A protein has these predicted regions:
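Rossmann-fold cofactor-recognition segment
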Residues: 39-52
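Catalytic loop of short-chain dehydrogenase/reductase
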Residues: 125-150, 155-164, 175-179
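C-terminal helical subdomain
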Residues: 173, 189-258
Length: 262
């Protein structure tokens, strides 16, 4: 039995593949979770756009961890489905729905699979790959941005929920950003020039790091320090036009009303 067990969704290309190649654990058993088999790594076939396949991963993870006697088990949610770029009214409705399944719901559902299966006796950790899109308001990437915001909030909330539960993993969302992956290349090649931020996105893409560099920086940042559930590898945008809230938020301060935090 391997001392380290690592699941990586989307380990077939980009950051996911480089995370597999650069794992710092020499004896690690790498398991790719993807729509297709990888020639070099064990694979579990799961289609993020099809929720009926997600329980295949649940059964696999439960079986592996129920008898796990190694030192650590890690799960990296990295996969991304890029079939619905574009302005909302121009994207095919079925593609848009698939993107919501794949990029918003699936990361949380697959994360839940791992968390629920983890037990005491070994270190466990869940890494949710986020993006600068979590803090950047980029037209044409609505499901992508929504998914990254969801990942970051979910990681922080479930981290707090599991703090008093023995045998549960540490959690961290890693906001990489600035990485020239295959989906980014595709986005740049197919971007509608009439989109408000098209020129900015194209210019930004040419200044990005390679997936190999990004993967190396991610591994350097893990595991996170105690109490940390979000790691960012780059600052957010300075341009107010690319920021959430800012001038788009009106704070009415209605007397007697307050948000309930606890």
């Amino acid at each position: 039995m391997a001392d380290t067990l690592i699941w990586i969704t989307g380990a077939t290309e980009g950051i996911g593949l480089e995370l597999a190649r650069q794992t710092p654990f020499a004896d690690a058993r790498i398991i790719n979770v993807s729509r297709r088999q990888h020639p070099d790594y064990e694979s579990v076939v799961v289609d993020l756009t099809d929720p009926s396949t997600w329980d295949d991963l649940r059964r696999h993870v439960e079986a592996e961890l129920s008898g796990f006697r190694g030192r650590r088990a890690l799960f990296v949610q990295n996969a991304y489905w890029s079939g619905a770029h574009g302005m909302l009214d121009q994207v095919d409705p079925t593609a848009y729905r698939n993107s919501l399944f794949a990029n918003v719901a699936a990361p949380l559902a697959l994360g839940e699979v791992f968390v629920r299966a983890c037990g005491p006796g070994y270190e466990s950790g869940l890494v949710m790959m986020s993006s600068g899109a979590a803090v950047s308001c980029l037209e044409g990437l609505s499901t992508y941005g929504a998914g990254k915001i969801a990942i970051e909030h979910w990681a922080q909330m479930v981290d707090k929920e599991c703090a008093s539960m023995p045998g549960k993993p540490w959690f961290v969302a890693v906001r990489a950003g600035g990485v020239l992956t295959a989906p980014v290349r595709h986005l740049v090649e197919t971007l509608d020039p009439k989109m408000p931020n098209a020129a900015h996105i194209r210019a930004n893409a040419m200044r990005r790091f390679s997936p190999a560099r990004a993967a190396a920086e991610v591994w350097k940042a893990l595991p996170p320090p105690p109490g940390v559930s979000l790691i960012t590898l780059a600052p957010g945008p300075d341009d107010p036009a690319l920021q959430f809230e800012g001038d788009r938020m009106l704070d009415r301060h209605v007397p007697g009303w307050q948000l309930v935090y606890r």
